[in-house]
Amino acid sequence: SNSDYLLDGFPEILILSNDLKDGQPIGVVDAGVEWHSDLSWQLDPPLGSILHCLTTPTTGGRTGFLNMSAAYQLLPKSLQERLLSLEGSHCVSKLVNSRVTISENRVNAAAFYAEQLKKHPPVSHPMVYEHPDTGEKILFASPRFTIGIDGLYEEEGQSLLDEIFAYFDDETIRYDYSWSEGDIVMWDNRSVLHCALGGYQYPDIRLIHRT
């Protein structure tokens, strides 16, 4: 489990890395490869997230960010209005999300995600909320953790999510960050999605601490 990759003495820090020690990964290898907001599968997700880069690969390894206030503004007015009254269902287990794939690097993946589903059943969050500091309307949904829309039949909910997620390809709401060793990046987890963009392979190493 991810608890195997917490930094010694600092349990709030998770190690993200493809480096190996005695043939085993020292961190979560394929963390965050789908667009997501950290821990949105919890009832009270964190307000912010911080990444500290310790080792960068020679190629790739960037992190993408999406502005979810701008994403909401991209939607047609009719869709904006419809989403105001809906709640999305968020879940950490990949077993209930057809949009994601289970990494080959995850040991005993099926058992792990079955246990996660048992420990962390789906929770609901508004599809759109008003940011408490800026007053902006924020689209709060992601391909990684949003598995359905409450009150809609499965097919209708998935179709609506597909329509929303298609807007995530718009370059005007996206920024890709290229890391240098020692960089620290922090962001508002409530209004920004992020994902690891890959593009490197072992023995090219990426090592990042997340909290």
Regions picked out by a protein language model, each given a short descriptive name:
Residues 1-186, 190-211:
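Fe(II)/2-oxoglutarate oxygenase catalytic core
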